């Protein structure tokens, strides 16, 4: 990136950056605005609440657009098949299969060793939050299970302050599956439009993805919006090419959203182990349960913690005897 490109990151006016759709200047302004809000402390609380409310409204508008997205996907797929032949469907099918294999490899080769290093039984953890994983497969939204995942991690014996800090932070910044999605789809779209990306272009695209993917919402359809914004900011891949994957985006999101949820659960448990904020007796007791159906009621969590302690004590006494 030359000096002129770096200087262009600073918008001449915030309104102009938003009006012209310059993603990187908007992102720069947003980051600086966030730092300023952090610096003023409690005085900026009303502004933070207002920005949060506006973001919820905007994402609801995106949700409305996603209701008619199948029509656009149908048109895009019809155009693709009509112009390039049925072989384009085979390419999309290969993308879906490859991506599912990639997500499975990530869980086995990355998340599993991390969980094992912190003495977390991955198969039991997957079974424990299996209902939440199935929900996000159907809804394609990690936000839909946030309350239940929060409650289940507390029921596992993780101290509430750790859950309250790590889990929301992970929802905002730890998008393992989404990063896999961005990388895979970006390379696929580049090949689909006949572009051979150089190493410098790939690294530049990766840098922009690292910036634009952070702070994203866990609502259905937000990933493809971020992808389109990233391609517009990079200028290397035509934004119109995103229409090629609209027909299979739902299948792809059914793979990467559960990876996001599982990654945040593993991260919360790992940090709890590191900080000594995990009740081991409760943790082992909950993972041994044949079924895990935890409500969001804090009193239910406290009852299950006490139950775990009382069930564990006789076992320890028997061992000592």
Where are these regions (language model features)?
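Short, small-residue-biased leader/transition segments that mark boundaries at the very start
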Residues: 1-3
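Hydrophobic alpha-helical segments of integral membrane proteins
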Residues: 5-10, 14, 47-65, 89-96, ...
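Membrane-interfacial loop-to-helix junctions in multi-pass transporters
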Residues: 21-25, 62-67, 101-102, 118-125, ...
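Hydrophobic mid-bilayer segments of alpha-helices in multi-pass membrane transport proteins
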Residues: 24-36, 68-75, 109, 226
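Transmembrane helix-loop junctions in multi-pass membrane proteins
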Residues: 37-48, 77-91, 122, 192-196
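Entry/N-cap segments of selected transmembrane alpha helices
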Residues: 86-111
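Helix-loop-helix junctions within the multi-pass membrane cores of secondary transporters/permeases
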Residues: 131-213, 268, 286, 290
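Transmembrane alpha-helical segments and their short flanking loops
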Residues: 183-314, 318-321
